[in-house]
């Protein structure tokens, strides 16, 4: 039986990575022996290239293709084999982040960047079975990022407002897959809500 792919999405500072770390320690989730991963990947040729691009003034198309190459490698080396072995895979960011972020970075280069990037992936990516969208006002996310001293070029107010709008559009277009989480609440509260939704999903599937 094919495994299940669960993804956590949201703008920077939404708290999804904090909850992803909590899920790795949660006994109810650990009982399923899931595979935890993230995008961009870490410690890989493609993932390292993406991280360098994020920290530099890389051309928007070059940046997209680096992210996409990392996604392809991630699918081939980890996600597909795990799913074929019946594993549950939980990924901190996945293809929806590319649609949302590159949908904004490419808006001055393409007429409809969101659909263009989605079309680029459509024939070969794996659509998640369940996606949590950690929704938060960009003003709050920027404040959080500033406190941890990790603000990047993607963490500007107008940019994040656009990214958030695309994330919410993706969720509205696919309500069967997306669960929208109010990410302004405490990580502990959100963890309980996410665990509850995951257990409900797995009991049905």
UniProtKB/Swiss-Prot annotation:
Identify the coding gene: tmk
Catalysis performed (reactions): dTMP + ATP = dTDP + ADP
The UniProt annotation places ATP binding at 10-17
Give the family, as the similarity comment puts it.
Answer: Belongs to the thymidylate kinase family.
| EC number(s) per entry | 2.7.4.9
Give GO MF terms, alphabetically.
Answer: ATP binding; dTMP kinase activity
Protein species of origin: Methanosarcina barkeri (strain Fusaro / DSM 804)
Gene Ontology biological-process annotations: dTDP biosynthetic process; dTTP biosynthetic process; dUDP biosynthetic process
PANTHER family reported for this sequence? THYMIDYLATE KINASE, UMP-CMP KINASE 2, MITOCHONDRIAL
Question: What enzyme class is recorded for this protein?
Answer: transferase
Which is a Gene Ontology cellular component entry for this protein? cytoplasm
The answer to whether UniProt assigns keyword Transmembrane helix to this entry is: no
Domain of life the protein comes from:
Archaea
Name of the protein in question: Probable thymidylate kinase
Keywords noted in UniProt:
ATP-binding, Kinase, Nucleotide biosynthesis, Nucleotide-binding, Transferase
Transmembrane ranges, per UniProt, are: none
Supply the InterPro entries for this chain: P-loop_NTPase (IPR027417), Thymidylate_kin-like_dom (IPR039430), Thymidylate_kinase (IPR018094)
């Amino acid at each position: 039986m094919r495994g299940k792919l669960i993804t956590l999405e949201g703008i920077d500072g939404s708290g999804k990575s904090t909850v992803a770390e909590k899920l790795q320690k949660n006994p109810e989730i650990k009982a399923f022996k899931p595979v935890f991963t993230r995008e961009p990947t870490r410690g890989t040729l493609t993932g390292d290239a993406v991280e360098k691009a994020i920290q530099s003034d890389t051309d928007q198309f070059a940046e997209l293709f680096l992210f996409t190459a990392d996604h392809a490698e991630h699918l081939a080396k980890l996600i597909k084999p795990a799913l074929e072995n019946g594993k549950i895979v939980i990924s901190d960011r996945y293809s929806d982040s590319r649609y949302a972020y590159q949908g904004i970075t490419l808006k001055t280069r393409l007429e409809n960047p969101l659909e263009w990037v989605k079309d680029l992936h459509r024939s070969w990516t794996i659509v998640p079975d369940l996606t949590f969208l950690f929704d938060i006002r960009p003003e709050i996310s920027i404040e959080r990022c500033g406190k941890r001293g990790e603000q990047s070029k993607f963490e500007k107010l107008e940019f994040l407002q656009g990214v958030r709008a695309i994330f919410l559009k993706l969720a509205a277009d696919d309500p069967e897959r997306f669960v929208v989480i109010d990410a302004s609440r405490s990580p502990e509260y959100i963890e309980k809500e996410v665990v509850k939704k995951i257990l409900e999903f797995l009991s049905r599937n």
